[in-house]
Design a protein with these regions (language model features):
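Small cysteine-rich, disulfide-bonded extracellular modules of the LU/uPAR three-finger superfamily
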Residues: 1-101, 110-159
């Protein structure tokens, strides 16, 4: 039986690092009071609000004393190629203000409309021509966007 080696896995991370990476958040089904299970064959969010370009994308490695803490453990950033991918998305206070977030997805190769301002990092759904390929999906308990909160999402994806 053939296996995907750690070197092969780190090459997958390297290929992903070279792609435009965005996180989208959405309303999902407005009747949710608790999150539905994520569908492994999902390709899109149910009701997209907007997209945010990744704030930070890097290799990382497991580290019991690491500063990056996610549900799967602690990690440290590294310049060395690894099979662990760190993704961070920091939204501004005004992004999707007043919206209720129930779903998020991380997308590769997101395509934007032409002519948008240089340096823009948050995009309403109508400013995106193609969401791209969904890498991650997570459903949440309803999260109401408040003007006094700056949302930040950290992920470590291990291949």
């Amino acid at each position: 039986m053939a296996i995907l080696t750690n070197t092969g896995r780190s090459e997958l991370v390297k290929a992903i690092l070279e792609q435009p990476i965005f996180m989208a958040w959405g309303r999902a089904d407005g009747t949710w009071t608790s999150p539905e299970s994520e569908a492994i064959d999902a390709t899109a969010l149910q009701d997209v609000i907007g997209f945010r370009k990744a704030t930070q994308v890097s290799y990382c490695e497991p580290d019991d004393n690491g500063a990056i803490e996610v549900s799967s453990g602690k990690f440290t950033l590294t310049n060395e190629q690894t099979r662990h991918l760190f993704l961070q998305f920091r939204f501004d206070f005004s992004d999707a203000l007043g919206e209720t977030i129930r779903e998020i997805g991380v997308f590769l190769n997101t395509q934007l409309k032409a002519g948008l301002p240089e340096g823009q990092v948050y995009f309403a759904n109508d400013e995106v021509t193609n969401a791209g390929q969904m890498l991650l999906l997570e459903n949440y308990r309803p999260l109401v966007r408040d003007e006094g909160v700056r949302e930040s999402f950290d992920f470590v994806v291990t291949f």
